[in-house]
């Protein structure tokens, strides 16, 4: 992904990949420590692995719809707590930052796909609320990776999806007025 981003950035701009496969929200401190000194902006795409950790709950049964919603609310509240703590660490770096939503899964099982897509807004709402409350831009990966060919497997973008994400990041970095502290959603 970072190689794709480097190909679409203006001459002289650099990009570093701090993400680690399998990393979760609580791992952000270690990732931020790896940031090069010359870092000028942060683009945060985190939380998908945390959400995947809750995938088994989609197979649980409930005695009522209210019971199921309360279980999902409990999971969402935990996610929100961790996400806010993570984001405080990011903002502590005093660099302009953007947040990415979590893209929708592409599970081969139709029922799991429907359940996953229905549950994902609980988590993306946390991300967008944090961004909007702090006047930050959002890169909406749900709208960017919107075709089957954008996915290499059920949970990761393909090269084509990566190209689309890289283009959206480059567009956001070139166009967004971070000093205005006004949120804007980027979808390409």
Task: Label every model-predicted segment.
Residues 1-21, 33-38:
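Serine-esterase "nucleophile elbow" of acetyl-processing enzymes
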Residues 1-8, 24, 64, 102, ...:
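Secondary-structure junction/capping motif
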Residues 20-25, 49:
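Short active-site-proximal "capping" loops at secondary-structure junctions
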Residues 30-188:
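Alpha-helical cap/lid subdomain in secreted, periplasmic
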